[in-house]
Amino acid sequence: MGNGANHFTKDSSPIPPHISPPYSPSTTTTTTTTTTTTSPTNTNTITIINIRAFDP
């Protein structure tokens, strides 16, 4: 029982809460705007990160 709970917290802690809340509402929005003005190629990279953060 202890192993199962530990595995879930380890696999669900550093991915969703670290990329979903802090990276989606603030960092992602700011980065997308800045990147779009800087280079169109970079926008593709940011879009992939955006979808990844919203998926999990």
UniProtKB/Swiss-Prot annotation:
<feature type="region of interest" description="Disordered">
    <location>
        <begin position="1"/>
        <end position="56"/>
    </location>
</feature>
<feature type="compositionally biased region" description="Pro residues">
    <location>
        <begin position="14"/>
        <end position="24"/>
    </location>
</feature>
<protein>
    <recommendedName>
        <fullName>Putative uncharacterized protein DDB_G0277609</fullName>
    </recommendedName>
</protein>
<feature type="compositionally biased region" description="Low complexity">
    <location>
        <begin position="25"/>
        <end position="56"/>
    </location>
</feature>
